[in-house]
Amino acid sequence: EAYPYEASATRIESALFDDWETWDDEQFEIHQWVATGERLDRESFGRYRAEGGSIISHSRTEEMTLAAISHPLTMIASDGKLENGRGHPRSTGTYAKVLGRYVRELGVLDLMDALRRMTIAPAERLQQRAHSMTQKGRIRMGSDADLTIFNPDTVIDRSTYTEPDVPSEGIEYVLVNGVVVVDEGELVEGVRPGKPIRSLR
């Protein structure tokens, strides 16, 4: 699984950072506090770690991202989320960025391969643990009508690390379980037709 960004996100209190007090000063500069967008130093990292919260770590290069995205076994996915409009741009831009930048602009993937990596490949990977995934990632009679209608000539992400909640361009309609949740590029307020996906017990 990969998403098309050179930064990751996690909690600052994660065990990943248990050795932070031994870091050189420049190691702090790759970290960004989600709530304010500020880059951190030793003092602010220690203060926020005691407080707890989300952090973005700018720890990869575009070459690393290209290698991950183009690998034949890679699926395109993101577990990112927004809280009060703050978070990682992968929450809103992952799929549009792959389609706009890595398919249309760079030609790293062809369109059908990118769509496979976003839909049927993750569904097949997960269906052994969650039977309801057999109804995802497919357009056929009886499957869940989860559909995204986009313009391949214009689709692109617009969210950033400081404005992660900006909607992508070129996504005209989104249906979840057959219900329109994005209509002519605009979010339909108050509509929540999604259902939980539960693992097999």
Where are these regions (language model features)?
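Divalent metal-coordination and catalytic microenvironments
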Residues: 1, 79, 114, 122, ...
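Active-site neighborhoods of metal-dependent hydrolases
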Residues: 2-111
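Acidic, glycine-enriched loop/beta-strand segments at the rims
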Residues: 55-59, 65, 106-113, 124-165
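C-terminal cap of metal-dependent C-N hydrolases
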Residues: 66-73, 78-81, 147-193
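Feature representing long, continuous alpha-helical segments
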Residues: 75-76, 93-97, 101, 113-116, ...
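Short, surface-exposed, low-complexity cationic segments
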Residues: 191-201
